Amino acid sequence: MDPLGAPSQFVDVDTLVSWGDSYEDEVNSSDSTAEAFQEDSNRSPFLYNRDINGKVVLWKGDVALLNCTAIVNTSNESLTDKNPVSESIFMLAGPDLKEDLQKLKGCRTGEAKLTKGFNLAARFIIHTVGPKYKSRYRTAAESSLYSCYRNVLQLAKEQSMSSVGFCVINSAKRGYPLEDATHIALRTVRRFLEIHGETIEKVVFAISELEEATYQKLLPLYFPRSLKEESQSLPSLPADIGNAEGEPVVPERQIRISEKPGASEDHEEDEDEGLGVDLSFIGSHAFARMEGDIDKQRKLILQGQLSEAALQKQHQRNYNRWLCQARSEDLSDIASLKALYQTGVDNCGRTVMVVVGRNIPVTLIDMDKALLYFIHVMDHIAVKEYVLVYFHTLTSEYNHLDSDFLKKLYDVVDIKYKRNLKAVYFVHPTFRSKVSTWFFTTFSVSGLKDKIHHVDSLQQLFSAISPEQIDFPPFVLEYDARENGPYFASYPPSPDL
C-alpha cells in the first residue's frame, strides 16, 4: 500500500504489535480462576474479547507516518489549525492537501470529512474537529467528542476502510482533560468494534509520550486482555459508560427507576414532570431499564387519559429504536444515490441540507431504508437550526414521494427536527407539485405549511442562500439556465454530483 518512493520512516500497521499480544500474564496457569470468573454473573460491560483486542494497537509515534487506509487529523472549523499533528500531516502530504481542503468549506465540531492522503503512506485523511472544553458545558463537549470518534469510524465503515490510525483528537489548546477524553475515545471505539468489527481490521491509537501513561492505564478497562484483567478493571470503570454505542448519557434525561416501587401514582407523575421537555436520550441506554405497565399504558391511550408527557416519552422511545437501527444497518446503497447531503450555510448561518428529487428512484429502493438513512444523516444536523433545499427539477412520477411516506417520516422523527427546521425551499416546482404540497401541508402536517417556499429560479434561491454555499447537481444548473436565462450557467456545479 506504500506509494511509490515513500520515505522509509513510514510504518506499516501490520508490523505493529496488537494490544492483545502485548499482554504478559500467567493466563495459562490460572485456568481455575478464569473458569470461576466466567461463571460469575458480575461481569464487566466490556468483556474480554481476544478478536477485538487483536484489532487494536497502541503505538507511540506520529500518526502521519502510519501506512494504513486512513489516518485522522484533528483541526479547527476552518481546517487550518496549527497543532503538531496537523503540521506533520500537512508537511508530509504536500501542497495538494491544502487545495483539497479548500473544497470542503470547513468542518463543524464533531463532524468528519474525507480527503486523499496525497504523499502520505495512508490513502486517505479523515479530518475532524474536537470540542472546546468548558466545565459548565461538559455534557455538550462529551457529546461532541463522541461524535468525532463515531463519525470517523462510520465514515471508515461506509468507505470500506480496513485500517484507521487515530491521533488524540482532543488537542491541548482546546482544553479537554486528557483522562476524560480518553474514556470517551476508548469506549466509543470498543462499542463500534463490537457492532461493526467485521468491517475494520485494525485501529491504531497513535499517541505521544505525554499521553502514553493515560492510555496504558485506561485501555484495560475497555479492552481487557484476559478474564483476570477484566475482573481487576471492573472497579475502576466510571459510573457513566455511555449507551450501547458509547454515547454519553445525560442522567437527568434518563427514565429513572423509583427507589420505592410501591409508591403512589402521584409520586410517579411528579418524577415524570421532573424529566423536563428534552427527552432526546430516553431509551438509548444499553442496559435494561424498568418501564411502566405496558397494558396499562395501552388502556389509558384507548381511554384518552394518557398524559402528554407520557405520549412524548413513548414517541421518543420509538424514535430511538429507529435511530439505533439506522446506526447499525448498512445503508451504503441509499447513500450512493446522493439524494440527501449537507452543503454550506444560509445567510443566517443555518446548515443547508439538500434533497435531489431526481436521485430518488422510489419504485426501486426500500423506502424504510430511505427513512433510516434520513434519520442517520439528519440526527446530528437537527440539533441546531437548519433549512432544506429540495430540487424538484426534472423529476418524474417514479421520483415522487407519496404522502403516506412523508406522513410516516414526519411522525417518526424527533421533535428537534420540526422545531429546528426553519425553511423548506421547493426549487423548480410544477403546478401539480404545488397543489399536492398545499393539500399535504393543509390536511396532514399543518405545522409545516408556513415553512414551505416555492422557488421558480435559482436567482430567487440566492436571496436566501449564496451560490457558494450550495453544491448543485449539473442538471439543475443546466435546466435553470435553459428556463431562466444563461446567467447561472457560469456557476460551477459540484464535480461529485
Swiss-Prot record:
GO terms for biological process: response to retinoic acid. SUPFAM superfamilies: CRAL/TRIO domain (SSF52087), Macro domain-like (SSF52949). CDD domains: Macro_GDAP2-like, SEC14. The modification Phosphoserine is found at S280. Residues 333-481 form the CRAL-TRIO domain. InterPro entries: CRAL-TRIO_dom, CRAL-TRIO_dom_sf, Macro_dom, Macro_dom-like, Macro_GDAP2. Belongs to the GDAP2 family. The gene is Gdap2. Residues 43-223 form the Macro domain. This is Ganglioside-induced differentiation-associated-protein 2. Gene3D superfamilies: CRAL-TRIO lipid binding domain, Leucine Aminopeptidase, subunit E, domain 1. Keywords: Phosphoprotein.
